[in-house]
Structures are given as structure tokens and as C-alpha cells.
Amino acid sequence: MGRSYIVVGGGLAGLMAAIKLAEAGQRVRLFSLVPVRRSHSVCAQGGINGAVNTKGEGDSAWEHFDDTIYGGDFLANQTPVKAMCEAAPDIIYMLARMGVPFNRTPEGNIDFRRLGGASYSRTAFAGSTTGQQILYALDEQVRRFEAEGRIEKLEHWEMLSVVKDGEGRCAGIVAQHLKSMRIGDFRADAVILATGGIGYIYRRSTNSVINTGSAHAAVYRQGASYANAEFIQIHPTAIPGDDKLRLMSESARGEGGRIWVYRDGKPWYFLEDKYPAYGNLVPRDIATREIFHVCYDLKLGIGGENMVYLDLSHLPAERLQERLGGIVGMYEKFVGDDPRKVPMKIFPAMHYSMGGLWVDFDQMTNIPGLFACGECDYQYHGANRLGANSLLSAIYGGMVAGPKAMAYAEAQRTPAGELAESWFAAERGRQEAEQRQLYAMDGPENAYRLHVEMSDRMVEHVTVVRTNAGLRQTDDFLQELQERWRRIGIDDRSTEHNRTVPFVRQLRNMIELARVITLSALNRNESRGAHYKPEFPERDDANWLKTTIATRTPDGPVLRYEDVDLQFIAPRQRRYDVSKAKGAVASGS
């Protein structure tokens, strides 16, 4: 019997992994919560990094690698990051051949812009809808393989758990069809998770509401390790709103946008004043903390509210339309002001998780046969992600995971199709029993209200500025929520298209993952990248230059630590008030 594979997640990482397997002649089933083209990758705006150096600035894969390690405050393992940066130019050219309509220079070359934390212009972009254009291009390739019978899409399916054989190896998944509510088991010789971010753990973020992290938590509950959970990226520029927060891409600053507030009656460009070498293109963690300082400490937010200006009005309207038309139109639609004429009002928002499932350099988790790639793994960004590295890491992670999953599967003696039915029936039965319990829940608590309470508390204590007292209170509160979750009442018992029952299950998983994030942050007594504690304001390499790894126990997460791979670049002080080279000299003197 031949080998078969399952990919869970229809964003960039999942599509790329499926494509690599199909290219090798393998059979792949691709599961997605939503139609593939509605995956959250479609929301990415700014671009994808690669040191192509068509502008002759002196960029190289090494410079990209150094910027990424430096920007991540030296917490990323260097071997996979170096390989990713070396592969990046070819990935961009591959996407162009697939039909991604990257902006071009007058000479016909792919155009590149500079984003935060980058020393050079290395971000290829398709206006301000790069994620959408790449997602659609990859989906066209997947559809070709569908027509050839090598990929089968199963949309509107949610993975509930993995199936493990008697030796603890992943042999498939149990999933639920969200229309019929049917639960089924599916065999695979290897499973690749590409299930995206965890933004819905926070009340309002730039993420889609499907980004619950529930799949991460499901396999964490089954023994998968979770790494660097404490590193949550807060994007400095989002459009405030009552329902959700809409990202205002870093490309707005890459094209010349300036952040400012009034001070003493005059515009104060505070990032340019404090960080003259990078100005408005400092990394996201730094820009976010400065905006918080201006609004909360200096009380200089617009009209006394927590907002600052992001100004594009000094730039030519034609250029804005050509290069930023998508986000300019979005702001005008949702706010009613024209950014070509008046400054935009923005404020930071939860955006991305640098942490994720622990994987080795082959993208495999500690559960044999279970791989992870994209935002759901922890591998490429350290303590802070640079803009436009997310699309790159998603695609590159998928390119690695596909072939490595195939190599793993082919090395196994017994194909999943020949394993005993009992393993699959037992796990399916466990999930069906759990579903019956969910339907029977008849307590006084409301699941959606519990989610609001949890996500508000996470925003308050586990985002930009963290204190140990606040983190302890948050963990105590999350444990209370776990008890209150047991007293939820289900108000919808329909057996088709039921949205409440899956949400209650997802909420349990979100609370579980929120505890991992909170306790990982509580334990790390230093400030590094996106993790900032005023009580411990400096980076502490002697004690904390290490990866946090969480393992689940019945009493909660147990944390251990793993050394970081530092074989290429020695850690140095991270500064953005001077150029990177000068900062390196200053820290070594």
C-alpha cells in the first residue's frame, strides 16, 4: 500500500506543504476550517522578504540572516533561520513564475521596499495585498493537483485530535465536519499542522476569528511541546475599532509614512527623534513600546485618547494608490477619512505569535510523524518577528515540512493504512463521547461571556508591558475560568451547522493555551524582544538566552529550557538608535 499524508490548514504554509508532497507524486488530504481562500494568510499586506539586491544596496542572504537574528534578540535557532534566508530569493522568483503580480520597477525587475528592522530594501510586494496574491497563486497550483487526483480538499473541517499508534507515533487525525457535525477518523503516514496563529485568545487583534489556536492546544493536550509562548507580537499600527482591529501595514511606513503626536503645539516625530538610524522603521516591539510610552506615560495621545498619527498625506497621491491602494481604501472605508489628505489615527494591536509548537530542524514536533509549519511553529523569529518575514517563514516552513514528512513516512515499516483499526476507533470514540458531553452541558455560564473575560484579561496583562503581579493574577483567573468552563450551558443543540458546540471546545483549548503564554511570561524575568517587564528591564543572556518549552500535565504547564543554536552569530547588544554595524562595535568595546 502507498503512503498518504494529511495537511491541516489552508493558508500559505499548508498549501506549500501540500504542493511539495503532490509534486513528489504523493496523495494528500488538505483539511481547512474555512474555504482555503478565506485562510488568514489572505490578510497579509506588506510583502515577503528576500535579499535579491536588485537595487544594488549591498544586501545579501547573510545580511538578511543577521537582521533576522538581531531583530529576534538572538533567541531564534540560527541554523534554520540561515537556511530560510538563503532560500528566500528563489522563493520570490518561484512565486513570480506562479503568477504573483509583484510590483515592478520601470526596468521590469521585481520592486522591493524596506520594512522595519531591515538594513536594506528586501521586501517584494504586490501593492498592499501581498498575502492575498500569494495565497491565490498557491491555491491555483493546488487546484491543478486536485484535478490530477493528488490533493483532496476537505473544507469546513476542524481537526479535533491526532491518532497515535501503540508506539506513540502520529498515524492520522480525528476531525469534525462543521456542517453535518459528523466526526470521522482519517489515516495518514504523516500529519502536517499549518493552523496559523492564536489571536482570538486576545479580545481584539488583527487576526481572524478562526485563529483560536485550538489545534495547537489539542496536540499540546496530547503531549506535543509548546515553545516560547511568551513572545506575542503587538503590531504598532492598527485601526482602532469597536468590533476588531484592522492592520495598517508596516508598508505604510516603508513608503515614507511618519508617526507623530502634538507636543507643545507642534508635531513631534518621536520615533525619528529617538532612533535616527531607523526612524519610523524600527522593529515592531520597539515602535509599540514607544507609542505606549507616549500615550500612557506622557499622556500625549490624540485628544487625550490612546491613539497617535500615522501620516501619509505628504506623499504623492498617485504613488499611494499604486503601492498602498488596498490599505488606503480600507482606512477610508472603515473610518471615513482619506489618508491621502489627513493623517490616520492608529494604535498597537495583538498581531502575531512568535511562539508555537516546538519543532526540530525538520519541522517535526516531539510526537513522531506530526509536523508543524507556519505561524503555529516557533522556529524562525526568536523574541520578535521582522515585518515581511512571516510570509517567508510560512512558505519556507511548508517547503521543508512536505519533503521531511515524506522522508519520515517512507522510513516507517508499516504504512498507516495497515495499522489496527482499534487505534482509530478508540480516538474517534473519545471525541464522540466528548461531543455528547458538550451537548449535555446545562450550567449557568455563557461561553461567549467567558471568552470576553479571558481575552480582556490577556490584553490587560499579557501584551506590551508585563508585571509578575499581573501575570500571577491572570493565571489565577485563568484557572478560575477553567472551573467555570465546566458550568457552561449550551443554548444550541442543533445537530447540523452548530456553531456553539465547537466554540465551547475551542474556548477550553484557548484557556489552556492562555495559561501556557501567561506562565511562560511569568517565569522569564528579563526583557527581550516583545517580552518586556519593567521590573527586569534588561536582556539577561546569562540566565535567559534559552528557549522556553512547555509540557502539559494535569496540574498545568511544566516549563523547561533549551539552549539556543548560536553557531553563526554571537549575541550582541540590540540597538536601533544607531546603525546596526555601529551598534555592534559599541557593544563590543
Regions found by a protein language model. Give the residues of each.
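Glycine- and aromatic-enriched mobile tails/lids
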Residues: 1-4, 17-20, 24-26, 30, ...
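Core beta-strand elements of the Rossmann-like FAD/NAD(P) dinucleotide-binding domain
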Residues: 2-3, 181-190, 366
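Glycine-rich Rossmann-fold phosphate-binding loop(s) that bind the pyrophosphate
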Residues: 9-12
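Conserved N-terminal glycine-rich FAD pyrophosphate-binding loop of Rossmann-like flavoproteins
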Residues: 34-67, 247
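Short beta-strand to alpha-helix junction loop
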Residues: 76-86, 124-139, 154, 205-213, ...
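Conserved redox-cofactor binding core of oxidoreductases
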Residues: 96-182, 187, 194, 235-240
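Glycine-rich loop(s) and the adjacent beta-strand/alpha-helix scaffold that form part
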Residues: 190-245, 302, 384-404
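An anion/pyrophosphate-binding glycine-rich loop and adjacent beta-alpha core
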Residues: 218, 224-337, 404-410
